[in-house]
């Protein structure tokens, strides 16, 4: 089969039940409004269980007590996760004070969870508090629309505090893309904000009546930082600047990390370069990519429905030509760009506008008052006096942005007293985990609760081999859906069963190579034994500046993944 047209443009066959649900939902209304009044269950029933995802929520339960409740003949302790729409991760201090209050007063866990989708989540919202949370968000100019399910999700943007003008321009585009691709249905406003039903019929000119075949993720990235991990995303706009001013974007399409254990029809994939476009075509191109995936994506198999599979089926050139046709443009050749890193610069950084930016390391993004480390209270105190904004990073950290010289000492004092500036190793700064147990229904192994002590052990190995000043990009994800982005790490652990993980090696520091499975279904002691040996070899045999992942490839420890659609599972 030629690249020109290797497979059918549209997959024929029986549609998945999710397609029926969307079609019958009356533009995402379902019977959610009626279900809210059903006090007999703490959860949502039937289609509503899935429909609430379009409104930014997932129904979960506390898995630590699930078996115990079942023995007592009680339903699981249902509660919702809510994910806010926050393009580019920028949040005002007024908004922060509102979400702090809600988390403390109206959630089971009392925490704010920063996520690597550059936003925050509330975990443990009981059904009676579901409508109030949407109304609270609306009252401060926020919403949770389209942060889950088959839509364009929260749009990421590089958290680059140094080049303030470039960041401001890129951030504006992240917001514009997010707004342009939002669903037009009034269901969200009617159900949560009590807005009147209007007589006009709903229309979805971009997303269509059955929305997208699967989730869709978009980024705006400013080289040389790849902090947003562009290759985990469907559509990526790489900022191209001239004289410090944004002039256009390189477009990369078809990244994604989710796989299914043992299912070789699934694979992680890096995004393909389509070409360069000047700024004025940005929204037309974004819409064209989304509508092409809307029409060509596989609606008969949700495990094969993402953009990465569409590209592999129809061919990159065919998909690209269709985007050009729909947008009415021709891509120019890719402009040069390179990445040098993807971690956050923890601590104070001076921007070109003479303001300072303080990046705080938040382990696993979990903001709570811990004994001796009142992180949540500390951030609230800063929010009360800070005149700039907060920025959530795609590494689950938080930037106190735009601090004038005169305010620096005051903010630093609060941060230090609250444990927000405690010294951590470079290794801990470059490690990340998804939430997993106890709230995630898909979790197979621990991630967030496992990572801190696991990194203690890794730090000990790094010290033993004399490389404590170095780091390895290390990530843990509780299941192969891959929210922890382990499939772009130098060392990635993918949960297989309680206490067991698949160990992936051979990714690189800048996040442009998918790691291959090195060992399957192993325990923490087995993982540490493997890494002890390999870190020891890296410390002795590496070349100048050579990262751990690149070393494992050069030393022949593991073959690199060159074409993941074909060789990931070899």
From Swiss-Prot:
Sequence positions that bind [4Fe-4S] cluster: 434, 440, 479, 483
Cofactor: how and how many bound: Binds 1 siroheme per subunit. Binds 1 [4Fe-4S] cluster per subunit.
Pathway involvement of the protein, from the record: Sulfur metabolism; hydrogen sulfide biosynthesis; hydrogen sulfide from sulfite (NADPH route): step 1/1
Gene3D superfamilies for this protein: Sulfite Reductase Hemoprotein, domain 1
Catalytic activity: hydrogen sulfide + 3 NADP(+) + 3 H2O = sulfite + 3 NADPH + 4 H(+)
Biological process terms in GO annotation: cysteine biosynthetic process; hydrogen sulfide biosynthetic process; sulfate assimilation
UniProt-listed PROSITE patterns: NIR_SIR
Pfam families for the chain: NIR_SIR, NIR_SIR_ferr
Keywords: 4Fe-4S, Amino-acid biosynthesis, Cysteine biosynthesis, Heme, Iron, Iron-sulfur, Metal-binding, NADP, Oxidoreductase
Binding positions (siroheme): 483
Enzyme Commission code: 1.8.1.2
CC terms in the record's Gene Ontology section: sulfite reductase complex (NADPH)
Molecular-function GO term, any one: NADP binding
SUPFAM superfamilies assigned: Nitrite and sulphite reductase 4Fe-4S domain-like, Nitrite/Sulfite reductase N-terminal domain-like
Entry keyword annotation includes Ion transport: no
Cofactor: siroheme; [4Fe-4S] cluster
PANTHER family: SULFITE REDUCTASE [NADPH] SUBUNIT BETA, SULFITE REDUCTASE [NADPH] SUBUNIT BETA-RELATED
Protein family: Belongs to the nitrite and sulfite reductase 4Fe-4S domain family.
Subunit structure of this chain's protein: Alpha(8)-beta(8). The alpha component is a flavoprotein, the beta component is a hemoprotein.
Function: Component of the sulfite reductase complex that catalyzes the 6-electron reduction of sulfite to sulfide. This is one of several activities required for the biosynthesis of L-cysteine from sulfate.
Annotated protein name in UniProt: Sulfite reductase [NADPH] hemoprotein beta-component
Naturally occurring in which organism (per UniProt): Escherichia coli (strain ATCC 8739 / DSM 1576 / NBRC 3972 / NCIMB 8545 / WDCM 00012 / Crooks)
The gene coding this protein: cysI
